[in-house]
């Protein structure tokens, strides 16, 4: 982890930026960006993972990703099967059955599943991590020390980041398989057409862009809750769930908008 994490100096900030709301917002967001960069460097650095940190990270991954995977995958598959059936029946009634599967893949797998997975992880394990860190910070815990930062912040970041990636990819693959079964049934005769369709949808531009979006969603969900450690103890004790979730939602919307512009313009 870098030697210095960009923690706030509230007294100085209030003196220098009083009466300048825009400057305060810019300073707060720049501090958040520096903190996010430092946190990601720590999370991807092998030197961070001492034995206690590895154990805490394994527990975080188990809670955030592994325990959530069966239920989330089941719900995604059921929703995908229902959506595929509705779209296929509706498209057939208009003579557009050849477009049904493509619509499901483009809308559900590429657009909806990554966003739903990000929100699911944020509400399930992100809020849990936020509450624990907020309670520690409210009691005056100093997360600027490397040991505390590595042991209490990095495991949650790694767990949430991997959870978003794992849930999105696993549910996406399962939905692709279920969509084929809903339209073609248990038969191999549609595999050639379906494989060609999936290859056309995930072209050399769409596939890496989708992976980039999933990764950015994962980073946003991983970093946003732990930014509570930047708050003063008094501010952390006042309740920060709405503020953190609002920032996370804005980040997800900004990422989605940037990806749509990259794909379609």
Where are these regions (language model features)?
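Short helix-terminus and kink motifs of transmembrane alpha helices
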Residues: 85, 89, 119-135, 222, ...
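Hydrophobic alpha-helical transmembrane segments of multi-pass membrane transport/permease proteins
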Residues: 68-89, 251-258
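Short, membrane-interfacial amphipathic segments enriched in basic
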Residues: 11-57
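Selective transmembrane-helix segments that form parts of the transport pathway or gating/packing helices
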Residues: 65, 69, 73, 149-174, ...
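Membrane-interfacial helix-loop-helix connectors in multipass membrane proteins
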Residues: 86-109, 170-215, 219, 223-243, ...
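Short cytoplasmic-facing helical segments at TM-TM junctions of multi-pass membrane proteins
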Residues: 131-157, 237
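Membrane-embedded or membrane-proximal helical elements that form or frame transporter/channel pores
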Residues: 73, 90-129
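Final/C-terminal transmembrane alpha-helix of multipass membrane proteins
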Residues: 237, 241-261
């Amino acid at each position: 982890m870098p030697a210095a994490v960009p923690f706030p100096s509230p007294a100085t900030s209030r003196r220098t930026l009083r009466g300048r709301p825009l400057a305060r917002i810019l300073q707060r967001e720049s501090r958040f960006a520096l903190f996010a960069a430092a946190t990601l460097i720590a999370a991807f650095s092998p030197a961070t993972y001492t034995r206690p940190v590895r154990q805490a990270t394994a527990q975080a991954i188990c809670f955030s990703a592994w325990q959530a995977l069966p239920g989330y995958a089941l719900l995604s598959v059921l929703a995908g099967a229902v959506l595929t059936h509705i779209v296929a029946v509706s498209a057939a009634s208009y003579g557009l059955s050849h477009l049904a599967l493509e619509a499901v893949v483009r809308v559900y797998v590429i657009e909806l599943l990554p966003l739903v997975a990000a929100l699911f992880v944020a509400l399930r394990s992100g809020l849990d991590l936020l509450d624990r860190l907020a309670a520690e910070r409210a009691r005056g815990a100093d997360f600027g020390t490397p040991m505390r930062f590595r042991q209490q912040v990095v495991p949650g970041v790694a767990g949430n980041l991997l959870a978003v990636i794992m849930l999105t990819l696993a549910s996406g693959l399962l939905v692709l398989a279920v969509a084929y079964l809903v339209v073609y049934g248990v038969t191999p005769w549609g595999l050639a057409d379906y494989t060609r369709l999936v290859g056309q949808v995930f072209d050399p531009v769409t596939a890496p862009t989708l992976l980039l979006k999933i990764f950015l969603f994962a980073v946003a969900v991983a970093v946003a809750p732990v930014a509570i450690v930047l708050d003063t103890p008094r501010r952390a004790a006042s309740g920060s769930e709405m503020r953190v979730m609002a920032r996370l939602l804005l980040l997800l919307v900004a990422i989605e908008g940037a990806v749509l512009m990259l794909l379609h313009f």
